[in-house]
C-alpha cells in the first residue's frame, strides 16, 4: 500500500496560546556586553546588542534567584545585594570597583521564533505575524500540544506517517540588533532553559 505522509507544524499560527501563557514561552540565558566601571556604580543595558523583536528580558521570575553578575576582573560573582534591576529602563545597576569589568547573565523570553525570524529575514517576508514560541515541557503547554496532536491525528485518519522536523530545542539561533546572526549553536540546548526546568 502507498503510505501517505504529511507534515504539520505544532506551533504554526498558535500565537494566541503563547500570549495567554507568557510564563511558558521558551527562554534562554543571555550574557550582556563586558562593561568597564569608571566609578563605584555602573549601569548595564541588558538588551544592548540583542534584537528586541526576538528577545525580551524575563521579569516574571525573580532576577536575584536566576541571574548572575560577575566581576570579570576578579572572576567573582557579585552578591545579589550589590545590584538592582530597573525594569523601566532595562538596565541593571551594580555597586562596582572602579576599572573592573562586569557582565550580567540573565533569562530572556524568545518572543519571535528564531526559525521563523530567519525565514522572515532571508526571504524578505512582509505582512507575516511574528511567530511566538512556547516550551512544550511546561505543564499547560505540554497538555495543549498533546491534545492538538491527538485531534490532528483523529481528523486525518488517511495519513499513516507523520514526520517531525525542526525541533528548535536542539539548536540556538540568536540575532543581534541589526538582525544578523549573533550566536548560532546547532548542537546545543541553550534555548531550552527556564526556572521550571532548573527547579
Q: Which residues does each predicted region cover?
A:
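Single conserved hydrophobic/aromatic residue that forms the stacking wall/gate
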Residues: 1-6, 10
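Polysaccharide-binding and catalytic clefts of secreted carbohydrate-active enzymes
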Residues: 22-199
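A cross-domain feature marking catalytic cores of carbohydrate-active enzymes
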Residues: 13-15, 166
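A short acidic, often aromatic-flanked loop/helix-cap motif at beta-alpha or helix-coil junctions
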Residues: 18
Amino acid at each position: 500500500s502507498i503510505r501517505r505522509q504529511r507534515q504539520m507544524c505544532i506551533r504554526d499560527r498558535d500565537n494566541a496560546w503563547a500570549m495567554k501563557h507568557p510564563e511558558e514561552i521558551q527562554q534562554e540565558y543571555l550574557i550582556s556586553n563586558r562593561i568597564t566601571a569608571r566609578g563605584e556604580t555602573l549601569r548595564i543595558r541588558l538588551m544592548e546588542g540583542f534584537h528586541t523583536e526576538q528577545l525580551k528580558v524575563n521579569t516574571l521570575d525573580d532576577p536575584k534567584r536566576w541571574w548572575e553578575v560577575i566581576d570579570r576582573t576578579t572572576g567573582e560573582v557579585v552578591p545579589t545585594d550589590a545590584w538592582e534591576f530597573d525594569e523601566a529602563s532595562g538596565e541593571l545597576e551594580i555597586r562596582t570597583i572602579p576599572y573592573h569589568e562586569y557582565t550580567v547573565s540573565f533569562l530572556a523570553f524568545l518572543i519571535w521564533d528564531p526559525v521563523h525570524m530567519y525565514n522572515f529575514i532571508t526571504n524578505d517576508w512582509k505582512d507575516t505575524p511574528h511567530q511566538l514560541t512556547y516550551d512544550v515541557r511546561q505543564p499547560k503547554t505540554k497538555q495543549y500540544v498533546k491534545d492538538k496532536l491527538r485531534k490532528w491525528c483523529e481528523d486525518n485518519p488517511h495519513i499513516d506517517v507523520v514526520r517531525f522536523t525542526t525541533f528548535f530545542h536542539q539548536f540556538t539561533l540568536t540575532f543581534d540588533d541589526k538582525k544578523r546572526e549573533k550566536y548560532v549553536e546547532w548542537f546545543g540546548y541553550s534555548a531550552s532553559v527556564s526556572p521550571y526546568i532548573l527547579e
